[in-house]
């Protein structure tokens, strides 16, 4: 992903023939270090590209797509005007709170799944402001924290071969939602508020009675870009109370 005009924080998408007959197209996500089960902001980008380049049948005002990826089938709605994308929303795979009130080195966090496992850390306990000047501090802290989490906690999806916490979201509460910075275990700083991470946060908030069904949650990256998310229904994954975000 670093050549010819890439960089270490970039996510790429390999478009392939789907296995599922329901899907319009298959997507294999990757970054500069590994394959990725699911990426929310890349799903938005792929869907925009498919519509804007007429790689799928475009229907106005909304083009419906089903993308198949390692995490499962993702249903996407692309709002279209004059043949171009205006906005993108997607229905993610079932997401759930795996474990709450975890602790490593006096840092409290919760673990949620939404295509990948995320550690969710309230940054108020760290006394570090979430801003661009502290990005490298969070990067170093995040990489070390994820290593220790995976050494201490036995994290396993009940039905899929996914068994690592690969991202950490540090967040502050704001007046209308939350502000965050997301770090991967390789030290990649997410360029967006993180779509998959937003779904993980929805699962945590819903299961801890901090968010209601269909209530809009605004998740903002430290640069000001924001995603909106909501819980559209409840479901269950093995023993876990899950949601469809």
Where are these regions (language model features)?
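A glycine-rich beta-to-alpha transition motif near the start of alpha/beta enzyme domains, typified by
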Residues: 1-103, 108-110, 123-245
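Glycine-rich phosphate-binding loop plus the immediately following alpha-helix
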Residues: 118-119
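Glycine-rich ThDP/TPP pyrophosphate-binding loop and its adjacent helix/strand module
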Residues: 115
